[in-house]
Amino acid sequence: MTLEQELRQLSKAKTRAQRNGQLREEAAYCHQLGELLASHGRFKDALEEHQQELHLLESVQDTLGCAVAHRKIGERLAEMENYSAALKHQHLYLDLAGSLSNHTELQRAWATIGRTHLDIYDHCQSRDSLLQAQAAFEKSLAIVDEKLEGMLTQRELSEMRTRLYLNLGLTCESLQQTALCNNYFKKSIFLAEQNHLYEDLFRARYNLGAIHWRGGQHSQAMRCLEGARECARAMKMRFMESECCVLVSQVLQDLGDFLAAKRALKKAYRLGSQKPNQRVTVCQSLKYVLAVIQLQQQLEEAEGNDLQGAMAICEQLGDLFSKAGDFPKAAEAYQKQLHLAELLNRPDLELAVIHVSLATTLGDMKDHRKAVHHYEEELRLRKGNALEEAKTWFNIALSREEAGDAYELLAPCFQKAFCCAQQAQRFQLQRQILQHLYTVQLKLQPQEARDTEIRLQELSMAKDTEEEEEEEEEEEEEASEAPETSELELSESEDDADGLSQQLEEDEELQGCVGRRKVNKWNRRNDMGETLLHRACIEGQLRRVQDLVKQGHPLNPRDYCGWTPLHEACNYGHLEIVRFLLDHGAAVDDPGGQGCDGITPLHDALNCGHFEVAELLIERGASVTLRTRKGLSPLETLQQWVKLYFRDLDLETRQKAATMEERLQMASSGQASRSSPALQTIPSNHLFDPETSPPSSPCPEPSSYTPRPPEASPAPAKVFLEETVSAVSRPRKTRHRPTSSSSSSEDEDNPSPCRPSQKRLRHTTQQGEVKIPDPPKSRETATSSACRAAYQAAIRGVGSAQSRRLVPSLPRGSEEVPAPKTALIPEEEYLAGEWLEVDTPLTRSGRPSTSVSDYERCPARPRTRVKQSRLTSLDGWCARTQAGDGSLNAEPAENPSVPRTSGPNKENYAAGQPLLLVQPPPIRVRVQIQDNLFLIPVPQSDIRPVAWLTEQAAQRYFQTCGLLPRLTLRKDGALLAPQDPIPDVLQSNDEVLAEVTSWDLPPLKDRYRRACLSLGQGEHQQVLHAMDHQSSSPSFSACSLALCQAQLTPLLRALKLHTALRELRLAGNRLGDACATELLATLGTTPNLVLLDLSSNHLGQEGLRQLVEGSSGQAALQNLEELDLSMNPLGDGCGQALASLLRACPMLSTLRLQACGFSSSFFLSHQAALGGAFQDAVHLKTLSLSYNLLGAPALARVLQTLPACTLKRLDLSSVAASKSNSGIIEPVIKYLTKEGCALAHLTLSANCLGDKAVRELSRCLPCCPSLTSLDLSANPEVSCASLEELLSALQERSQGLSFLGLSGCSIQGPLNSDLWDKIFVQLQELQLCTKDLSTKDRDSVCQRLPEGACTMDQSSKLFFKCL
């Protein structure tokens, strides 16, 4: 039924109810009409229906109905972006629900209010709206947990929780609370899947995909969006599916795959949009994408023969990318344009224009240093043009200002710009330059601002006698701009004009690339890289899976994320499909591709709660010890899943989880009787990569693809549900990520099967036909063991391993073992004729079926094509046995038709001389050592034992991580013996697990030398001396050595696993952000570390973020008690990282953040995160924030969040932003007067305090009896009056101060005797340092000095202390 038919039907029913006076019925039809209209984007009409519904229900005094009507009116107003009116109606809904004590409606009211505040945040980015939204959602969730449990069905409760978790996840994502965000989304998706809530599942997956996209995690984003798209299809909601396609196109654009992005946008266009502006957005995005594709194709054609045209196209591409906000691609295009212009020797002025484009684009990318470089190049190319020089110098000054350069570097640029503008007599430009210079001087050099202001006034009074330069003409529209919609292949008739069904549309997604090369039919993929088998496994179509496998579909292909069909079947819980795939040889322990984080099918099943599937995998031999890249075993994955969802699990599921946990524990400890894997009836060729399994048919068509290199991709701005952002206007961020791009095809609507760059290159080969001759009757024998070994090595490389796997193995308990028969013909039996054909592609169409057996005909595809020569002719290389030794020397044949002779007797090769064949390709073995995976080639020319592989893996790990492990290797849980030959136990592309049994840890000095040697870094003598003298000490110090990152790396690697280390001091070096990961790796191996000093190490926000992210979930900083990050340029933006760091160090008692570049903006961006972190730091005793120009407001925010009951020492030296910042003492007094304040030591030196401030401070001393030490030094406006005030206030306390510092204050002598008496009574230590002290003061101290006290009296210093 169409929309118009439904509307007519409901309108008739509404009219009938109106005639009959049935007001409630009429209101119900109004409600239904409003919902239907709103679902199709007609919000204004829907609003009128709900308003009519409200009037009708008010007339019959239906309070609950009125409440619901207010909710619907509020929702419609919110959709029309009238948020104030929407909130008014929603609060009326809340009040009415409260008056009825209806907890269900109260829950919905709070949830609706929260969603509206979330929409307000999306509209105006107000943080206050976010906090209100979070509070509303939490109230709603509390009602569900506390009031509605037991009142509603489990499904209704799950539905409420699903939506609340989703909304809380969105709120936490905007608040940058990543961990909470991920947990909420996981809970929402889990509940939606369990209860088949497809609309909520769609929203959760869609939003999670958008979050992954914004975070640059394209693989995860594509998988989430595909899941959302499946939900939209299941609900037959075309608009929702259209939104998914739009977001998929954005992801693909970021990856540089504009052909695939075009296909996704065309699908979105055909599906339609709920809002008219969304359809306009899709059209604009499609125009942009098509323009890019057109220009890229023109550029590819022009690069070969028309460099001038290519240069123009590069400029058009750069302009197009710039307008779209894709600045990295724009910069790349302009850079290419510049390169071509230099090759063509274009004029200087033309080169200067390109440099301007590059500089502007780099400025948009916030890379102001490089922008300055290009402006300087423009300046060099435009000598003599005063006006252009003025503009360029002005741009240089602005870029340097953005880069944060000092005033001394900015001022000359402004001055040169102003002088050039004067020469060009451009008064308006002069005013602009002086105005900006004036603004800069107010911030950086206030004393010079007055002169600039005077010059500005003089300039504004002067009359401009010349006409100002006209505005630059607007850029003409690109010649290659996309044509109108009708020309852009947007027509509904292009791909589905014949009324194709949904199934045909899905088949269109899986069409192969119709390019120049013939492509394997099984390698057809959709935009996600999914094959037909992937789709069948996702949709649970067992019959389809069976048909595909029987027809020869590969079993283990990967999609673009890296998932195999078995992964998908396990993820969706299709037990019978999993069973079928395992029966036919699917890889049970496949860890997935690069985007899968090492998740095996068992991990996937457990992470989705499919316990029957997990049980089947374990029975079929799945490893229970393999870990993901995050270090999680299957058992830990299950425990994490139970912990996350425990509250939402029913009793049966909890019991199943407990049973599975016991099963995994028994299996991992070796107590479970593990079922042997079923015999693989269709085994994979061991020379295949795991990305594509061999087909089950004997002679499959080979697949091929062309990989593209990775390039820089931008991370886009935020996109929310039901609100897509045009590709022409979204801002970008610069990131480097692997991209996937489609290869060219004749029909661009067909997805390409050869897109993802992570796939490995494959070549198609055909195995040569082998003819086995009849045994000869007689022959001379001259056999040697060396000859047979050479043959065996050669034939092993040809593909005999595949045949061995196909032959059934003997039972282990068999007593009668038949004599082994060699697959080779002994030299004494073979014929001298040419019995082995050349292994080149054959031209004949077929072979007799009786020539060889089936398994001998099965192809073996090596990775690299190897041309094999005939064994009985000298077409390639032959070997000669030198007299006196048995070595083989290979030489090229001089005449391929004449047999070569060797040896002194010149015997013909037919008499028994061996041949040296071309070396077979090496076996590749993947070795997993903890979180590192190494691919190690094993040459087959010499049979290597497993011990050799172990040594190679250990050396590679040492080269990468700096630690030399002692390893044992396991394959599928079986221990590999060191003496076994590698080809006998492993096949190419097998993955083995290396278990670290111990570490090779020589003395610290030797470890440092070994690390320097492996890194090619020279030894630093002072570090070597420190290593020698501190090797057995629990403390290691390498301070003030100015070690650069290259010199610090071997030092940090040498300290790995130095478990005795408790204190590490690296102050005064150049660690920087780049070395943070190396430091983290070392900290992760020193669990007993309690002190870490990283002060003055050039550590910035990025380095701190890396330390925090790497230490999350690990024990790297768990025992740390003292951390010094002073004198590092952390800046105001480090708030989130600092909060995470505090949470990662639960035992931290001392934190020093002196001179870290904090300003008045500190705490503004991440106040909630930092506040919560400080409040949770229950062990924090000492905090230093000195020498950060916080100012009074920022200091107040800081002190509000500090734990008053536990903090003992607080250093706030020199935190006043300026001399006029007189309110610095007020937040300190508020903190001291807090209930339970435990502060004992307070430092307020160098804060421009005066007598008034000290007077206010002294009044609060009786309220803070814990304070025993006060440092007010370096405050020159503090006089004797302040000292008297302090002493008087101390008399009101039960005890005085143990320390009072007044050095650098204006204490003038002589002090009267009463004052000295108070000093000796109330103070145990006093420091005075002022030139105004007199000799009488010194005499008074000597006369009144109590026993056990000492003094220091020298020049202007007067210190005393009671011992």
Swiss-Prot record:
GO terms for cellular component: cytoplasm; nuclear replication fork; site of double-strand break. ANK repeats lie at residues 528-557, 561-590, 597-626. InterPro entries: Ankyrin_rpt, Ankyrin_rpt-contain_sf, Leu-rich_rpt, LRR_dom_sf, MMS22L-TONSL_complex_comp, TPR-like_helical_dom_sf, TPR_rpt. Keywords: ANK repeat, Chromatin regulator, Chromosome, Cytoplasm, DNA damage, DNA repair, Leucine-rich repeat, Methylation, Nucleus, Repeat, TPR repeat. Residues 666-684, 842-853 have a biased composition (Polar residues). Residues 465-510 have a biased composition (Acidic residues). Residues 692-713 have a biased composition (Pro residues). LRR repeats lie at residues 1060-1081, 1088-1108, 1119-1140, 1147-1168, 1179-1199, 1206-1214, 1238-1261, 1266-1287, 1296-1317, 1322-1343. Component of the MMS22L-TONSL complex, a complex at least composed of MMS22L and TONSL/NFKBIL2. Interacts with the MCM complex, the FACT complex and the RPA complex. Interacts with MCM5; the interaction is direct. Binds histones, with a strong preference for histone H3.1 (histones H3.1 and H3-4/H3.1t). Interacts (via ANK repeats) with histone H4; specifically binds histone H4 lacking methylation at 'Lys-20' (H4K20me0). May interact with DNAJC9; the interaction seems to be histone-dependent. The ANK repeats mediate the interaction with the MCM complex and histones, while the LRR repeats mediate the interaction with MMS22L. This is Tonsoku-like protein.
